[in-house]
Protein backbone atom coordinates (compact mmCIF):
# COMPACT_ATOMS: atom_id res chain seq x y z
CA UNK A 1 0.00 0.00 0.00
CA UNK A 2 1.42 3.38 -0.99
CA UNK A 3 1.57 6.28 1.44
CA UNK A 4 -1.18 7.97 -0.56
CA UNK A 5 -3.42 4.93 -0.14
CA UNK A 6 -2.62 4.74 3.58
CA UNK A 7 -3.52 8.40 4.08
CA UNK A 8 -6.78 8.05 2.16
CA UNK A 9 -7.73 5.06 4.32
CA UNK A 10 -6.84 6.76 7.61
CA UNK A 11 -8.79 9.91 6.77
CA UNK A 12 -11.79 8.03 5.38
CA UNK A 13 -11.68 10.02 2.15
CA UNK A 14 -13.71 8.94 -0.88
CA UNK A 15 -13.13 9.76 -4.56
CA UNK A 16 -16.79 10.59 -5.14
CA UNK A 17 -19.76 11.42 -2.94
CA UNK A 18 -23.48 11.93 -3.14
CA UNK A 19 -24.05 15.32 -1.51
CA UNK A 20 -27.52 14.52 -0.19
CA UNK A 21 -26.31 11.25 1.33
CA UNK A 22 -23.37 12.95 3.04
CA UNK A 23 -25.63 15.71 4.39
CA UNK A 24 -27.88 13.05 5.87
CA UNK A 25 -24.89 11.12 7.21
CA UNK A 26 -23.56 14.15 9.10
CA UNK A 27 -26.97 15.12 10.48
CA UNK A 28 -27.71 11.58 11.66
CA UNK A 29 -24.23 11.38 13.20
CA UNK A 30 -24.86 14.52 15.27
CA UNK A 31 -28.35 13.40 16.26
CA UNK A 32 -27.13 9.96 17.30
CA UNK A 33 -24.46 11.47 19.53
CA UNK A 34 -26.94 13.80 21.23
CA UNK A 35 -29.43 10.98 21.74
CA UNK A 36 -26.74 8.74 23.23
CA UNK A 37 -25.80 11.43 25.75
CA UNK A 38 -29.09 13.13 26.72
CA UNK A 39 -27.33 15.44 29.19
CA UNK A 40 -25.97 17.33 26.16
CA UNK A 41 -28.29 20.23 25.42
CA UNK A 42 -26.35 22.35 22.95
CA UNK A 43 -23.98 22.28 20.01
CA UNK A 44 -21.51 25.18 20.06
CA UNK A 45 -19.57 26.31 16.99
CA UNK A 46 -17.52 29.35 16.05
CA UNK A 47 -18.74 30.94 12.81
CA UNK A 48 -16.11 32.77 10.75
CA UNK A 49 -17.94 33.35 7.48
CA UNK A 50 -15.82 30.77 5.67
CA UNK A 51 -16.82 27.55 3.93
CA UNK A 52 -16.13 25.07 6.70
CA UNK A 53 -17.88 26.76 9.62
CA UNK A 54 -20.81 27.70 7.39
CA UNK A 55 -21.29 24.06 6.40
CA UNK A 56 -20.80 22.67 9.90
CA UNK A 57 -23.12 25.31 11.33
CA UNK A 58 -25.90 24.53 8.87
CA UNK A 59 -25.64 20.81 9.58
CA UNK A 60 -25.73 21.45 13.34
CA UNK A 61 -28.85 23.58 13.10
CA UNK A 62 -30.56 21.02 10.86
CA UNK A 63 -29.73 18.25 13.35
CA UNK A 64 -31.08 20.26 16.28
CA UNK A 65 -34.24 21.18 14.36
CA UNK A 66 -34.94 17.54 13.56
CA UNK A 67 -34.27 16.36 17.10
CA UNK A 68 -36.54 18.97 18.62
CA UNK A 69 -39.32 17.98 16.27
CA UNK A 70 -38.83 14.25 16.82
CA UNK A 71 -38.42 14.34 20.61
CA UNK A 72 -40.32 17.43 21.65
CA UNK A 73 -37.25 18.48 23.64
CA UNK A 74 -37.27 22.26 23.32
CA UNK A 75 -34.16 22.63 25.50
CA UNK A 76 -31.90 21.57 22.63
CA UNK A 77 -30.16 24.43 20.85
CA UNK A 78 -27.43 25.32 18.39
CA UNK A 79 -25.26 28.23 19.48
CA UNK A 80 -23.30 30.07 16.80
CA UNK A 81 -20.41 32.05 18.22
CA UNK A 82 -18.91 35.10 16.55
CA UNK A 83 -15.25 35.39 17.58
CA UNK A 84 -13.72 38.48 15.94
CA UNK A 85 -10.29 39.81 16.83
CA UNK A 86 -11.17 43.49 16.90
CA UNK A 87 -12.96 44.26 13.63
CA UNK A 88 -13.37 41.34 11.25
CA UNK A 89 -12.25 42.11 7.68
CA UNK A 90 -14.94 39.92 6.10
CA UNK A 91 -17.70 40.90 8.50
CA UNK A 92 -20.38 40.82 5.81
CA UNK A 93 -19.53 37.22 4.94
CA UNK A 94 -19.99 36.28 8.57
CA UNK A 95 -23.36 38.00 8.66
CA UNK A 96 -24.33 36.21 5.44
CA UNK A 97 -23.31 32.87 6.95
CA UNK A 98 -25.43 33.54 10.02
CA UNK A 99 -28.38 34.45 7.81
CA UNK A 100 -27.97 31.18 5.89
CA UNK A 101 -27.58 29.01 8.99
CA UNK A 102 -30.40 30.64 11.00
CA UNK A 103 -28.95 29.55 14.37
CA UNK A 104 -31.08 29.32 17.49
CA UNK A 105 -28.72 31.65 19.30
CA UNK A 106 -25.86 33.92 18.27
CA UNK A 107 -23.21 35.09 20.73
CA UNK A 108 -20.35 37.47 19.99
CA UNK A 109 -17.10 37.29 21.94
CA UNK A 110 -14.41 39.72 20.84
CA UNK A 111 -11.16 37.94 21.67
CA UNK A 112 -8.79 40.87 21.13
CA UNK A 113 -8.72 42.03 24.74
CA UNK A 114 -8.03 38.54 26.06
CA UNK A 115 -5.26 37.90 23.52
CA UNK A 116 -3.58 41.23 24.27
CA UNK A 117 -3.83 40.58 28.02
CA UNK A 118 -2.23 37.17 27.60
CA UNK A 119 0.48 38.63 25.40
CA UNK A 120 1.24 41.32 27.98
CA UNK A 121 1.39 38.79 30.82
CA UNK A 122 3.91 36.74 28.82
CA UNK A 123 5.88 39.87 27.97
CA UNK A 124 6.17 40.65 31.68
CA UNK A 125 7.54 37.14 32.16
CA UNK A 126 10.18 37.80 29.51
CA UNK A 127 8.46 36.05 26.59
CA UNK A 128 7.79 38.16 23.49
CA UNK A 129 5.37 36.45 21.13
CA UNK A 130 6.18 36.27 17.43
CA UNK A 131 3.39 37.14 15.01
CA UNK A 132 2.95 33.46 14.13
CA UNK A 133 2.67 32.35 17.76
CA UNK A 134 0.28 35.22 18.45
CA UNK A 135 -1.86 33.77 15.68
CA UNK A 136 -2.01 30.46 17.53
CA UNK A 137 -2.90 32.41 20.67
CA UNK A 138 -5.94 33.79 18.82
CA UNK A 139 -7.05 30.32 17.75
CA UNK A 140 -6.74 28.97 21.29
CA UNK A 141 -8.56 31.95 22.77
CA UNK A 142 -11.42 31.30 20.37
CA UNK A 143 -11.62 27.68 21.46
CA UNK A 144 -11.38 28.65 25.12
CA UNK A 145 -14.42 30.91 24.70
CA UNK A 146 -16.38 28.16 22.96
CA UNK A 147 -15.65 25.68 25.74
CA UNK A 148 -16.73 28.22 28.35
CA UNK A 149 -20.01 28.66 26.50
CA UNK A 150 -20.41 24.90 26.14
CA UNK A 151 -19.72 24.46 29.84
CA UNK A 152 -22.47 26.89 30.75
CA UNK A 153 -25.03 25.45 28.32
CA UNK A 154 -24.43 21.70 28.80
CA UNK A 155 -22.93 21.64 25.35
CA UNK A 156 -20.24 20.16 23.17
CA UNK A 157 -17.92 22.08 20.87
CA UNK A 158 -18.24 21.24 17.19
CA UNK A 159 -15.19 21.26 14.93
CA UNK A 160 -14.79 21.98 11.23
CA UNK A 161 -11.87 19.65 10.50
CA UNK A 162 -12.13 17.77 7.20
CA UNK A 163 -9.82 15.55 5.17
CA UNK A 164 -8.18 18.38 3.20
CA UNK A 165 -7.32 20.13 6.45
CA UNK A 166 -6.41 17.03 8.44
CA UNK A 167 -3.94 15.79 5.82
CA UNK A 168 -1.84 18.95 6.16
CA UNK A 169 -2.37 19.49 9.88
CA UNK A 170 -3.54 22.98 8.96
CA UNK A 171 -5.05 23.83 12.31
CA UNK A 172 -3.82 25.04 15.68
CA UNK A 173 -3.14 22.31 18.20
CA UNK A 174 -5.60 22.81 21.08
CA UNK A 175 -7.04 25.71 19.12
CA UNK A 176 -9.41 24.98 16.27
CA UNK A 177 -8.11 21.41 16.41
CA UNK A 178 -9.33 20.94 20.00
CA UNK A 179 -13.00 20.02 19.62
CA UNK A 180 -15.47 17.38 20.76
CA UNK A 181 -17.12 16.27 17.53
CA UNK A 182 -16.29 16.76 13.84
CA UNK A 183 -19.18 16.20 11.42
CA UNK A 184 -17.15 17.09 8.29
CA UNK A 185 -14.36 14.58 8.87
CA UNK A 186 -13.89 12.49 5.68
CA UNK A 187 -14.84 15.22 3.18
CA UNK A 188 -12.33 17.09 1.04
CA UNK A 189 -12.65 20.77 0.20
CA UNK A 190 -14.51 20.43 -3.09
CA UNK A 191 -16.89 17.93 -1.54
CA UNK A 192 -17.71 20.45 1.17
CA UNK A 193 -18.60 22.89 -1.59
CA UNK A 194 -20.90 20.25 -3.09
CA UNK A 195 -22.77 19.94 0.20
CA UNK A 196 -23.16 23.70 0.53
CA UNK A 197 -24.41 23.99 -3.04
CA UNK A 198 -26.97 21.26 -2.34
CA UNK A 199 -28.07 23.15 0.77
CA UNK A 200 -28.62 26.37 -1.19
CA UNK A 201 -25.79 28.33 0.38
CA UNK A 202 -24.86 31.68 -1.22
CA UNK A 203 -21.99 30.90 -3.60
CA UNK A 204 -19.66 33.63 -2.35
CA UNK A 205 -19.35 31.88 1.01
CA UNK A 206 -17.76 28.77 -0.50
CA UNK A 207 -16.06 30.27 -3.54
CA UNK A 208 -13.98 32.77 -1.54
CA UNK A 209 -10.28 32.04 -0.98
CA UNK A 210 -9.93 30.10 2.30
CA UNK A 211 -7.83 31.86 4.95
CA UNK A 212 -7.11 31.24 8.63
CA UNK A 213 -6.41 35.00 8.96
CA UNK A 214 -4.40 34.61 12.16
CA UNK A 215 -1.27 36.63 11.40
CA UNK A 216 -1.18 40.41 11.80
CA UNK A 217 1.85 40.76 9.52
CA UNK A 218 0.16 38.76 6.75
CA UNK A 219 -3.56 39.51 7.08
CA UNK A 220 -5.99 37.28 5.18
CA UNK A 221 -3.12 35.08 3.99
CA UNK A 222 -4.67 32.44 1.70
CA UNK A 223 -4.34 28.88 2.99
CA UNK A 224 -2.96 27.79 -0.37
CA UNK A 225 -0.09 30.29 -0.10
CA UNK A 226 0.74 29.12 3.42
CA UNK A 227 0.63 25.45 2.40
CA UNK A 228 2.45 25.73 -0.92
CA UNK A 229 -0.18 23.62 -2.68
CA UNK A 230 -3.73 24.28 -3.85
CA UNK A 231 -6.85 22.68 -2.43
CA UNK A 232 -7.47 21.23 -5.89
CA UNK A 233 -4.08 19.50 -5.57
CA UNK A 234 -4.98 18.21 -2.10
CA UNK A 235 -8.44 17.07 -3.18
CA UNK A 236 -7.02 15.25 -6.22
CA UNK A 237 -4.52 13.50 -3.95
CA UNK A 238 -7.27 12.49 -1.50
CA UNK A 239 -9.39 11.18 -4.37
CA UNK A 240 -6.56 8.84 -5.37
CA UNK A 241 -5.64 10.71 -8.52
CA UNK A 242 -2.12 11.16 -9.85
CA UNK A 243 -0.65 14.53 -8.92
CA UNK A 244 2.73 16.06 -9.85
CA UNK A 245 5.59 14.52 -7.88
CA UNK A 246 6.49 17.78 -6.14
CA UNK A 247 2.87 18.28 -5.10
CA UNK A 248 2.71 14.76 -3.65
CA UNK A 249 5.97 15.33 -1.77
CA UNK A 250 4.69 18.60 -0.30
CA UNK A 251 1.39 17.05 0.82
CA UNK A 252 3.07 13.97 2.28
CA UNK A 253 5.65 16.09 4.08
CA UNK A 254 2.85 18.10 5.71
CA UNK A 255 1.09 14.88 6.66
CA UNK A 256 4.13 13.24 8.23
CA UNK A 257 5.39 16.23 10.18
CA UNK A 258 1.95 17.03 11.60
CA UNK A 259 1.10 13.49 12.68
CA UNK A 260 1.31 14.55 16.34
CA UNK A 261 -1.58 16.97 15.76
CA UNK A 262 -3.92 14.15 14.78
CA UNK A 263 -3.18 12.05 17.86
CA UNK A 264 -3.81 12.32 21.60
CA UNK A 265 -0.81 13.39 23.72
CA UNK A 266 2.14 11.08 23.09
CA UNK A 267 2.82 8.39 25.68
CA UNK A 268 5.52 5.77 26.24
CA UNK A 269 3.35 3.32 24.28
CA UNK A 270 3.49 5.37 21.06
CA UNK A 271 6.13 4.76 18.43
CA UNK A 272 4.82 6.51 15.31
CA UNK A 273 7.31 9.32 15.85
CA UNK A 274 10.26 6.91 15.64
CA UNK A 275 9.51 5.87 12.06
Curated annotation (Swiss-Prot):
Annotated binding of Mg(2+), by residue: 52, 165
UniProt-listed Enzyme Commission number(s): 6.3.1.5
Pathway assignment: Cofactor biosynthesis; NAD(+) biosynthesis; NAD(+) from deamido-NAD(+) (ammonia route): step 1/1
Coiled coil: none
UniProt name for this protein: NH(3)-dependent NAD(+) synthetase
Record keywords, A-Z: ATP-binding, Ligase, Magnesium, Metal-binding, NAD, Nucleotide-binding
Quaternary structure (record): Homodimer.
Family note: Belongs to the NAD synthetase family.
Gene Ontology annotations of biological process type: NAD biosynthetic process
Amino acid sequence: MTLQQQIIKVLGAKPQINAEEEIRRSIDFLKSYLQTYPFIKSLVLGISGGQDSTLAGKLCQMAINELRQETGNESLQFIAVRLPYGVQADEQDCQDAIAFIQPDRVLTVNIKGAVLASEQALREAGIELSDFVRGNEKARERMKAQYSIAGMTSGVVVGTDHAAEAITGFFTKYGDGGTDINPLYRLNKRQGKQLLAALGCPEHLYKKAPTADLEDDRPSLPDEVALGVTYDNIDDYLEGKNVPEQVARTIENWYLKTEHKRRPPITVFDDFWKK
